[in-house]
Amino acid sequence: MILTGHALRERFQALDDFLVSHQSLWRPKPFTCPVLPWEAEHAELAAWLRRRSLAQADAEHNHPAELPAPAPFPALARRAAELSALGQLPSRELGPLPERLSVDVPGRKWQQISAFAERLLFQRQPAHWLDWCSGKGHLGRLLAQGGQHLTCLEYDPQLVEAGQRLSERLQLAASHLQQDVLADDAGARLTAEHSPVALHACGDLHVRLLRLASAAGCAQLAVAPCCYNRIAAEHYQALSAPARASTLQLSLDDLRLPLAET
């Protein structure tokens, strides 16, 4: 099930409560102190984990919820799995694409771009795509195969130039513009007609897009953020009212946890 409205707010509140209640378990950074602060309270679990061999840890690295560990681990693992479960977005067929479209794009990156594009099912047919922090604009060019206009914003002038050449080679109506999206003049690049997209926009970059797109009156956008720790502030700055009301304050170290897991 795709969470929206009241269901999304309920899930957020449950997840927030879970993280606040058990922050003594997840906040301490591993490998920074000989004994973790929670070991005295959960002595049996701590002893069990310390008996595990490196080979066992490597074998179970990608399936931590399946560990046959003592309490309170099983209950916490089940609840964490429930709260992190997400519905599968519907997808669409992209149709036949020019072979040149994926030239010079690493295979893994092209898979991510294609998977992102397949799940963009906007209620309104986009008339003008805006590829935020676009690099060479591979995502934007894929989306613009329907004949829509395309604007790509990128900070690196070499990527801007390379992207413009690729778009011209495919005869697309695309403009590749050099832009620092964190600069004061970035908002002038967005208008209500744009359908902004951002794939792997790190930290402040995706937050900046959300703010500017909202201010510009963009009716729809799609963002796949990453690297939440790459922000200028010392703590995460929430945008939604429920998140701002939370007592949980996430530091840069807290925001690095997903990266540490991988």
Feature map (PLM): residue ranges:
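Class I S-adenosyl-L-methionine
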Residues: 1-37, 175, 182, 188-262
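Conserved alpha-helix/loop element of class I SAM-dependent methyltransferases that forms part
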Residues: 110-125
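Conserved class I S-adenosyl-L-methionine
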Residues: 126-133
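Conserved SAM-binding motif I beta-strand of class I
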Residues: 149-154
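Conserved SAM-binding loop
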Residues: 163-164
